[in-house]
Structures are given as C-alpha cells and as structure tokens.
Amino acid sequence: MHRTTRIKITELNPHLMCVLCGGYFIDATTIIECLHSFCKMCIVRYLETSKYCPICDVQVHKTKPLLNIRSDKTLQDIVYKLVPGLFKNEMKRRRDFYAEHPSVDAANGSNEDRGEVADEDKRIITDDEIISLSIEFFDHRAQQQGCTEERQKEEVNNKRYLQCPAAMTVMHLRKFLRSKMDIPPTYQIEVMYEDEPLKDYYTLMDIAYIYTWRRNGPLPLKYRVRPSCKKMKITHPQEGLNNANRSESDSASDKACSPAGVPSTSSPLPSPSTLVQPSQPHFTHISSPINGTTMTSPNRQFNFSKVRKSALNGSSTSSG
C-alpha cells in the first residue's frame, strides 16, 4: 500500500503567497511571459514604474506591460480552498470597504468584487462548517438487480441523516457506526461514496471537494460490513531446514560427547516424552517436563543390572 503523508500549509506557502506584499494571493494574476503570479493590485502598482518581472527580471512588455498579465482564477480557487477562512475574511473586508466609502462606484464590478458572494455560492467549505449527510447500507445485489419502487421506499426508510463538522474524518464515522449498531470487532466497516471505498483519513470536506458535492442535498454516503480477514502465520521452508540441520548437529555433538559405557538413547519404540515433544532430542535417563511439571518415568526403556561407571574429572568412580 502507498503511504499517505500530510503536509503543512506552511510548506506550500511559497506557492501561495505574493512576494510583493508577503500575503496570500488575492485576485491572483499571472505574467504570461514567465508564469509568475502576484496579487492583482500588487503587480499593477509595480508595473506602473517597471516593465520587468519582480522575480526573474524578464521583460513583461516593451511599452504596455499590463497587456501581458492575466487573471488566474484556478490559482485563486486553490488558495481559497487551502487557507481556512481566507475567502470569508476577504468578502467581509470588501463589504466593509464599500459600506465606509459609498461614493466609490462598484456597480460595474461583479458580486465577488463587492463581497456579496457567500461560501456556498463559491463552493468554499470551512473546517468549522456543519455538513448534512445521509448514511445507508450498501447492497450490491440490489444495485445489480435494479431499483424498483419497493426497493426505493426501503432505501428511504433505511437512510439516516446526520449533521457533522466538515473536519470529521471517515474513521470517526466508522467508530460511530460500530458503537451505534453494536458491530463486533471481528467485522470491519467500510464507508463508501457510491461504490468507492473511502480512506480513513478523508474528512467530509475532502469528500465534498473530491466528488464535487454541489450542496443540492445531503452528502450521500454508504457503508458495508464484512468479516475481517485473519492474518495467517507463514513459516518459510528455509527456517524449517535450518531448524532440522540445527537439531541434527546438536544430536551429533551429544553422541560425540557421551561416554563409551553409556548405551545409545535411540530406540525403535517411541517413549511418551518423544510423543509429546517430537522436535527435541530425547534422553531416557533425564526427566522430561510435561505441562510445566517434571515427571520421572518409573518404567524406563533400559534396565541396567549394574550401576554404570562414568569418568568424572578424569577419575573412574564406582558405587556398590
């Protein structure tokens, strides 16, 4: 999966701010010769005394530099959507200006120039805005069979309507659905727009921007519930071979270090301890732990008539 990283608005500031005034673009305007952008008022005032770009010194025009600048609506929309509250504050400043200066003729300007455009008309969504949404169960079989009048009535009855802040994420909505419907943790919930699953880090504002929600109704969301996939533990064959080789080498070293008088522990009949732990080497003269307790088998495989002799510290000892 691709890892998604969030970046801060300060990292984008060099692309969103005017070098002439040091603020965010307002009425972004671009020079067509070099594609550098500025605020409209800033670049118009600058070109009154200069014919060169303030960033790269490219000549804008020999005699009339204002002919080679263009309004950049796309860049301005990006700035308004990325910077919280910028559009609302700018519209308020314009309304206040024309209220304090009624003599200024603004009849020829647009509604945006006069500050009479609301966030809804501009499709600008703020973090603290309340968004209405509808949530319903996603039934792929019903979509394949087609919608009848009865199914449409059922869908209307199964819809639930919520009012949530625009900054709420899909993860919060999933947690709300799980707690509301008592869905056990063995099932996973997917929130969807139409038939496309949504990422957990998407906010309602992101969904509205990505899928161009027009505010002509509640934001339509769906959800589905399905069992969680269990993760299977995969053992690599290489590890098994290494373990087998390791056990063989251990058993070989044990045989090499054993005294000559001690009989071999290998036997054609399996002992109970070997049935319990088949992967470990078994020694009949050593008590084996079973279920955390040490047990000594009374009936050993090998019955010694005499006590064996073993070399201890280079000397032979025997007990009668």
Curated annotation (Swiss-Prot):
Biased composition annotated in UniProt, kind: Low complexity: 262-281
GO cellular component terms, semicolon-separated: PcG protein complex; PRC1 complex
GO MF annotation list: promoter-specific chromatin binding; zinc ion binding
Assembly information from the UniProt record: Component of a PRC1-like complex. Homodimer. Interacts with cbx2.
Region (Disordered): 234-320
Span(s) of short sequence motif Nuclear localization signal: 81-95
Comp. bias intervals (Polar residues): 285-304
Protein name (Swiss-Prot/TrEMBL): Polycomb complex protein BMI-1-A
UniProt-listed GO biological process terms: cerebellum development; chromatin remodeling; hematopoietic stem cell migration; negative regulation of gene expression, epigenetic; negative regulation of transcription by RNA polymerase II; primitive hemopoiesis
Its biological purpose: Component of a Polycomb group (PcG) multiprotein PRC1-like complex, a complex class required to maintain the transcriptionally repressive state of many genes, including Hox genes, throughout development. PcG PRC1 complex acts via chromatin remodeling and modification of histones; it mediates monoubiquitination of histone H2A 'Lys-119', rendering chromatin heritably changed in its expressibility. In the PRC1 complex, it is required to stimulate the E3 ubiquitin-protein ligase activity of rnf2.
First and last residues of each zinc finger (RING-type): 18-57
Location(s), subcellular: Nucleus
This protein's UniProt keywords: Chromatin regulator, Metal-binding, Nucleus, Repressor, Transcription, Transcription regulation, Zinc, Zinc-finger
Gene name, Swiss-Prot/TrEMBL: bmi1a
Coiled coil start-end: none
Keyword Zinc (UniProt): yes
Keyword Zinc-finger: yes
Organism for this UniProt entry: Danio rerio
